[in-house]
Amino acid sequence: MLNDIKKQRLSEKEYDENFDEIHPPLNEHEAYLEGDRCYYCYDAPCIEACPTGINIPLFIRQITSKNPEGAAKTIFDENILGGMSARVCPTETLCEEACVRNTGEDRPVKIGLLQRYATDSLMNSSDHPYKRSEDNGKKVAIVGGGPAGLSCAHRLSMKGYSVTIFDSKSKLGGLNEYGIAAYKSLDNFAERETKFVLSLGGIDYKLNTTIGKDLTVDQLKKDFDAVFLGMGLTGVNSLLVDGEDNNGIDDAVRYIEDIRQAKDLGELPVGRKVIVIGGGMTAIDMAVQIKKLGSEDVTIVYRRGQKEMSASLVEQQNAQNNGVLIKHWSKPVRLITNDNSVCGVEFEYTSVKDGKLVGTGEKYKIDSDMVFRAIGQTFEDDADGLPTLGSGRISVDENYKTSISGIWAGGDCVNEGEDLTVSAVEAGKKAAESIHMELS
């Protein structure tokens, strides 16, 4: 049956089971045993592999010394969003990949789970671990309340600045709130972590406020001593094939947002046969979640090979373990429609010739009720007065300064680094230090 899209494909119990945590937290005993596996290396490679430079051997030693709150403070010193980072960071390609335990055992210390144990311990039992410095009389505007913006705001508030965050959404948190797979972050953790950051004080925020529409860059420069741009990527790349305006095709990021904000997962429309086009984490998260929502056949189609997929091998294997089929070396050439609704996609096999990706001319079709685009997001620069762009994003120097005096930028809107929560946190932290150096 074509166009088989409906709600309530599963029972309430099945939804609860499917969206339970993928990596349950460690208890005290488990954390001690896992932490005891650490060699506490000198010049530890795991620290070098962490984008925020957390002293991993130190916080693990603090855990094994029965001081999880002290371990959390060590983590928060470098990454104030360490709780969410512990849940969503691709540790298998960062700190855990660098762990020397891999050499002999191929089983690294579970750094991510240990980090979560520590940060959860402090957030569940203690007051905010930092005190705000005396107000220094200076004001900073932050555009975007995602990881980069929250990190920058917290660091500046600690130094006595009055910070105002402007965000276009109805909640702060950015992708942590709207874009993370629901089974990776349960119990409104993103919202709780945001409240934890704000509890330091000195941070105001205005929601449903969009730069270029509700306020201008010039206005911010006039009203504040410094401006930090930490907007996310709000545009989505097109497939560049005919038929994208038909029913049944959607952006993966938009649907994931619906999942994250849904009060009842059963109210989400789910196709029986689903195609996700892309090879990154968004594609994986989309495919796994639509499968967990009751779709029978879910296929990820990527234009290059497995090694070229930006999603980690662990995440690819997780998708396959959840029943998702991944097809490589294929690109969409036509959406097949029936009565203004998508009923399939025609693909062409691809190969690399003279260093370029080309179609082979051989084609095949996959039936589908729903198709999701997950081929990358773009920075929408429709606001007047924005700094110079490079490669479609804001250009910054090594101190996160833009081409406009008094304006800094960091996170996904900037043309450097990886689009990771932990990388955005580091950008916000470094930009805050740069702003402080400039204004103090």
Regions found by a protein language model. Give the residues of each.
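Ferredoxin-type iron-sulfur electron-transfer modules in oxidoreductases and energy-metabolism complexes
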Residues: 15-34, 55-87, 105-132, 259-260
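Local cysteine-cluster metal-coordination motifs and their immediate loop/turn environment
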Residues: 36-55, 81-103
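Feature captures the FAD/FMN-dependent oxidoreductase FAD-binding
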Residues: 134, 139-141, 191-241, 334-346, ...
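Beta1/beta-strand and adjacent pyrophosphate-binding region of the FAD-binding site
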Residues: 135-145, 270-277
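N-terminal Rossmann-like FAD-binding beta1-loop-alpha1 element of flavoenzymes
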Residues: 139-162, 283-291
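A conserved FAD-binding loop/helix module that cradles the flavin
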Residues: 413-440
